[in-house]
């Protein structure tokens, strides 16, 4: 085996490399494309490099854009169908999610409240369209950002971004945390309870639906555990306590007619299952809460039906869905239920993360 040791004078110097590159460039300026293609690919790359202009590295803060310049800007999303990647298929929803801004909402008593709101806006995209200019969704929504929001304003925003984007179907969803003053059970104290609420306006096939979602957090005492505890007390004089747990229901309603105020929907939930978790608590309130739970033990099946009983009795509610999750203190798993009324919320397949999303984050 021969070992070749590189010596210092075998390594070209920088000057020699520059000279060699100059010779190569001079040759390439006169050579044909076929001659350059015949070179070793590594060498050919050296002579194919086009001269790159010197560019400014400083941000041009004084540069202004006029219509003529704007017209020269590339717009890939509005390009021809030939630029589409993948299957040339219609997309039901494409847009932006979770852009946030403060929004004023009309309250049932005639006042207004400003709340941080997370907005999701999507439109349909036809098969022969490359894409959408997503910033138009936000710009269209911002035109109405100073209004006092109700579904009429959301509809106006939807009209605008459908027109701006030339889409057939569209959706706006607005998520917020709605505060309500809630009295304690016995002490006379009160505190702010926050309710996760989402407003959703959907247009599909020319038909619009107004939907409200509410997460309601309550305590559920297991009826079976309550009876077993009482059995231990009665038959053996053994102290025992039934298990109860924080539970979450997501109530979704399609609005009809005059619709439903946030406060009305919350009151319906509270009337169905009165064991709502408490805000301000003294000892007498804690005792009262224990009594309230003992008076209203429920399985997760009971919870779904109790909520449904309230919803189906309200004239402002059309289709609805009730999902409940009792996050068991006895078991390592949760107990869940889902009840729907009408076609709006009927579905064959469920999102694998649907029930795990029923969690209260303080």
Curated annotation (Swiss-Prot):
For this protein, the record's InterPro entries field holds: GTP_cyclohydrolase_FolE2, GTP_cyclohydrolase_FolE2/MptA
Q: What's a Gene Ontology MF term here? A: GTP cyclohydrolase I activity
Enzyme Commission number(s) from the entry = 3.5.4.16
Example GO BP = tetrahydrofolate biosynthetic process
Site annotation May be catalytically important: residues: 222
Identify the metabolic or biological route this protein is part of: Cofactor biosynthesis; 7,8-dihydroneopterin triphosphate biosynthesis; 7,8-dihydroneopterin triphosphate from GTP: step 1/1
Q: Which reaction does it catalyse?
A: GTP + H2O = 7,8-dihydroneopterin 3'-triphosphate + formate + H(+)
**Keyword Oxidoreductase on entry:** no
Function per UniProt: Converts GTP to 7,8-dihydroneopterin triphosphate.
Concerning its family, UniProt says:
Belongs to the GTP cyclohydrolase IV family.
Which NCBIfam families does this chain map to? PRK13674.1-1 (NF010200)
HAMAP family, A to Z: GTP_cyclohydrol_B
Q: What is this protein called?
A: GTP cyclohydrolase FolE2
Q: Which organism is it from?
A: Jannaschia sp. (strain CCS1)
